[in-house]
Amino acid sequence: KSQFIEMFGNPLSSKQKNELKRLGQCCIINPRRPNIALCDTDKVSFIPMPAVSEDGYLVDMADEEYGKVKKGFTYFENNDVLFAKITPCMENGKGAIAYGLTNGIGVGSTEFHVLRPINGISSPYWLLTLTRMPIFRERAAKNMSGTGGQKRVSASYLNHFMVGLPAIEEQRRFEAIY
C-alpha cells in the first residue's frame, strides 16, 4: 500500500495529478453474466467468503459442477476483483483478484461486488490495492446501508466513487512490483 501511495499519491484526494473519474468509469461493477457455453456437468471454481483472506488473497477454492452453482451465486472471471460488501468482511479488508479459475469462471458469495478491469484503462492490481486501502474502506463504511450487522456497500456507491485514475502504463509498472 505504501508503494501505491508513493507511485500514485492519495487516489482519494481532491488534489490530484491524475484525472478524477468515477470508479464506474475505471472498471465494470458487477458485470452481467454472459451466455456461457458450459454444460451443467462442467466444472467451475467456487469461492465462498471464507476462501478470501483479509490480506487480499484467495486461500481456498473448490471445483463445483456449473449446473449446481449457476444460479444463486455471484459470477466472476479470471482477473476480476472481488470486494466484500457486507459488515464486517468489508471493514476487515476481504477482497482478492480472481485467478486460476477452472474454465476461467468462478462463482461465490452473493456478498461480493465484482470489479472487472477495463482493458487499457485499469489493472486488477490497482483496483485491488485501491479497494483495500483503509481510507477507501472507511469511506465505504460511512456509506453502508442496512440494519444492524447486515449493512452493505451499494454498487451505486462504488459506481459514483471519485478516484484519481493513473495512466495504464503507471498501473502496469505497479503491477510488475506487486
Predicted regions and their residues:
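Sequence-specific dsDNA recognition surfaces
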Residues: 24-36, 47-81
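A short beta-sheet element
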Residues: 72-74, 78-132
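Short coil/turn segments at secondary-structure boundaries
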Residues: 16-19, 36-44, 142-144
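Short amphipathic beta-strand starts and helix->beta connectors
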Residues: 98-100, 143-147
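A short glycine-rich beta-alpha junction/loop motif
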Residues: 105-113, 145-172
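Short, solvent-exposed alpha-helical surface patches in well-structured domains
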Residues: 25, 126, 139, 160, ...
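Non-catalytic DNA-recognition/assembly elements of restriction-modification systems
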Residues: 1-36, 168-176
